[in-house]
């Protein structure tokens, strides 16, 4: 028997055109021969009997019943005057979505489409404008402010009712999404809510909240494929402890007050690009399992990403932080981009770990920049960075290349105890001392590379230091170049040079370079006696106010030209117990 196309319109039934043309079914105007009339009538009776049976199957009856319940629930849900009735409609709609998704008599695509239509109805309610949303913070206060327009008490009640209905929708969706996620992810704790068996197809549905006015808390809820693009959050936006599955978008969202994503979990891609946070933005302890984009975001209030974990790429390119930004103990497994970012307040990256490349090129730090005790596992790119106040890299480790070429440092730069295991480039960098403001009075104006360790080549060629710079106890394991650098004063007491050192075309404006021990706790600068004597080059520019005073020193039957007071050492004479080299030459003279 050919497949029937059924239409409920006016009780008519339509047969496929192909079946009519093939003669399998009667068509308009068909008249059987007299000898076939009895046989044809019998066949038609069988056909319509089968059709009635097909129409009245339990599955068909259930589906028709759902459509009727949907119509009734929708009428309840759209009732704008009775919150209890609206809530009843919302519960029914959510339950109907469950029923469609678990109806195995239908193909998956049909089940998904029926459920998606219901979800679109619910999310459409969330997107509906609500005039009182903009007055949320006023209406949530205890007393009406002076000059309030309208009935304050009545508006308070109306706002609470609308908040209840809309948040209940999120809670009903969250309950189902949490159950589905908990059943598919091993090790997850079971959700505190109990629910009947749910279809995993809930995870395939789309939840469009784009452009919605959100004026209620959404903490500790579950979201799936949630689109909050261009949404406006009135009053505090609370996503504390929320869990997001599927791609999530907050692109161009407007947060009019404080926003909390503290402890939130983003299990897939999330985008906040072009969003605006007017108040404080709290992402401390948040977990990002996939790529996260905060590109071009504006943070007007304080931003807190302390203890945040990014397991993939983290993109903050061209973002603007107008107040303090706390990224202390940040952990990024993928490429972290802060390129061309503007930090208006203090930027703190203390004890952070960047496992892959970290890009800060062309960023501007208007207040102190603190990277102390951080670890850069991949290339650290700070080319062209501008720091207008102190820059703190004390105890920082650079496991790969560190590029500060063309960087501009102002006031106080501290690389004390930093370790550079890859090539370190400071070529054309500027270390500038500007007139102090009251805010900067506690910081001496100099650059500090004391105890810094450079395991590979170090390049300070054409760098400019308009403040005194100290390389006390610095360790240059391989070649270091200061070719063309400009100094006010440079101090290399107790520094160790393992291979070549190029000081040609240097300039010293106020104080001659010092390689001698100025204090008891310091020793003279040391140059390896196993290096090429031609690799140590000391030649100031003719116009330099101060130059090098050089002499000779001998060790291992080799003679070197060194600055007066510096010594040669034998790298093979290291005494582990005494923590010093035991074969040292007399000072150069």
Model-assigned labels for residue ranges:
Residues 35-102:
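Membrane-proximal alpha-helical anchors
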Residues 2-3, 16, 23-28, 32-33:
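Short, low-complexity intrinsically disordered segments enriched in A/P/G/S/L with frequent Arg
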Residues 24, 28, 36, 563-565, ...:
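Generic alpha-helical structural signal
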Residues 3, 19, 34-37, 51-52, ...:
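Intrinsically disordered, low-complexity regions enriched for glutamine and histidine
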Residues 11-13, 553:
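General secretory precursor processing signal
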Residues 2-4, 40, 63, 112:
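Short intrinsically disordered, low-complexity coil segments enriched in acidic
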Residues 68-75, 81-91, 99-589:
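N-terminal leader/targeting and pre-domain segments
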């Amino acid at each position: 028997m050919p497949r029937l196309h059924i239409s409920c319109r006016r009780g008519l039934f339509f047969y496929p055109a192909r079946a009519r043309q093939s003669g399998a079914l009667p068509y308009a105007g068909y008249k059987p021969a007299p000898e076939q009339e009895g046989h044809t009538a019998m066949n038609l009776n069988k056909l319509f009997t089968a059709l009635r049976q097909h129409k009245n199957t339990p599955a068909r009856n259930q589906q028709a019943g759902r459509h009727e319940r949907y119509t009734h629930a929708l009428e309840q849900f759209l009732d704008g005057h009775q919150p209890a009735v609206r809530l009843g409609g919302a519960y029914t709609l959510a339950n109907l979505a469950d029923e469609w998704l678990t109806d195995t008599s239908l193909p998956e695509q049909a089940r998904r489409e029926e459920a998606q239509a219901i979800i679109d109805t619910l999310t459409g309610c969330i997107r509906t404008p609500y005039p009182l949303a903009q007055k949320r913070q006023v209406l949530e206060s205890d007393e009406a402010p002076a000059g309030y327009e309208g009935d304050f008490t009545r508006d308070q009640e109306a706002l609470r009712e609308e908040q209840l209905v809309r948040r209940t929708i999120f809670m009903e969706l969250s309950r189902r999404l949490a159950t589905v996620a908990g059943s598919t992810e091993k090790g997850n704790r079971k959700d505190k809510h109990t629910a009947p068996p749910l279809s995993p197809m809930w995870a395939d549905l789309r939840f469009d909240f784009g452009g919605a006015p959100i004026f209620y808390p959404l903490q500790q809820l579950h979201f799936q494929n949630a689109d909050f693009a261009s949404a406006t959050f009135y009053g505090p936006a609370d996503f504390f402890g929320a869990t997001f599955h599927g791609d999530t978008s907050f692109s161009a969202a407007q947060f009019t007050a404080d926003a909390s994503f503290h402890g939130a979990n983003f299990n897939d891609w999330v985008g906040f690009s072009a969003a605006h946070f007017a108040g404080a933005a709290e992402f401390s302890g948040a977990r990002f399992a996939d790529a996260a984009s905060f590109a071009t975001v504006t943070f007007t209030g304080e931003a807190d990403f302390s203890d945040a974990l990014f397991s993939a790429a983290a993109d903050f390119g061209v973002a603007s932080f107008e107040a303090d930004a706390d990224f202390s103990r940040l952990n990024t497994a993928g490429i972290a981009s802060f390129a061309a970012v503007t930090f208006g307040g203090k930027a703190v990256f203390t004890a952070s770990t960047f496992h892959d490349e970290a890009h800060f090129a062309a960023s501007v730090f208007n207040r102190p920049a603190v990277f102390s005790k951080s670890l850069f596992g991949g290339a650290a790119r700070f080319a062209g960075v501008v720091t207008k106040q102190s820059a703190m890299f004390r105890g920082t480790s650079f496991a790969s290349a560190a590029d500060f070429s063309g960087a501009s440092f102002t006031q106080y730069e501290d690389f004390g105890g930093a370790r550079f295991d890859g090539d370190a480039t400071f070529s054309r960098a500027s270390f500038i001392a500007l007139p102090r403001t009251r805010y900067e009075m506690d910081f001496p104006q100099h650059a500090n590379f004391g105890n810094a360790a450079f395991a590979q080549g170090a390049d300070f060629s054409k760098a400019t230091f308009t403040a005194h710079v100290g390389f006390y106890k610095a360790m240059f394991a391989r070649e270091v170049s200061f070719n063309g650098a400009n100094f006010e004063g440079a101090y290399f007491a107790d520094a160790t040079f393992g291979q070549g050192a190029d000081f040609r075309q240097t300039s010293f404006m106020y104080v001659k370079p010092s390689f001698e021990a100025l204090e008891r706790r310091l020793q003279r600068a040391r140059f390896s006696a196993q290096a090429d004597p031609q690799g140590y080059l000391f030649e100031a520019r003719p116009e330099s106010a101060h130059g090098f005073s050089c002499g000779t020193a001998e060790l291992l039957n080799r003679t070197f030209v060194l600055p007066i007071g510096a010594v040669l050492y034998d790298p093979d004479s290291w005494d582990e117990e005494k923590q010093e080299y035991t074969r040292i030459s007399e000072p150069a003279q």
